[in-house]
Amino acid sequence: MNTATKVKNLRRWSGEATVYRLDPPYRGEEYVVVSSIHLPKSPWKEETMIFASTEAGEVPSYFDLAVVKEYSHAAALASIGYEVKS
């Protein structure tokens, strides 16, 4: 089973952002930031994006690995085949 383990919450992001450790790595990326935001003026209303990151939450590129049109870290991680480990 592919698992995503929460490492830490990030404070300087809009919405809710968390660093996860992926096991096994996804496309060579062991750490990702999953960011959920509300978009009141968008037809989607909310979205969650996944970005490759360091363990500290630094994002070298804002090219997203995945996007889902809902406010859910679990749904975004499931879209790339991972289950959040509790």
Residue ranges and their predicted role:
Residues 1-3, 16, 46, 52, ...:
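A detector of low-complexity, intrinsically disordered, Ser/Thr/Gly/Pro/Ala-rich segments
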Residues 1-26:
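Negatively charged, low-complexity tracts enriched in Asp/Glu with abundant Ser/Thr
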Residues 7, 55-57, 79:
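Compositionally biased non-globular segments, especially hydrophobic aliphatic-rich helices
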Residues 25-71:
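Acidic, low-complexity, intrinsically disordered interaction modules
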Residues 65-86:
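Short, compact, well-ordered microdomains
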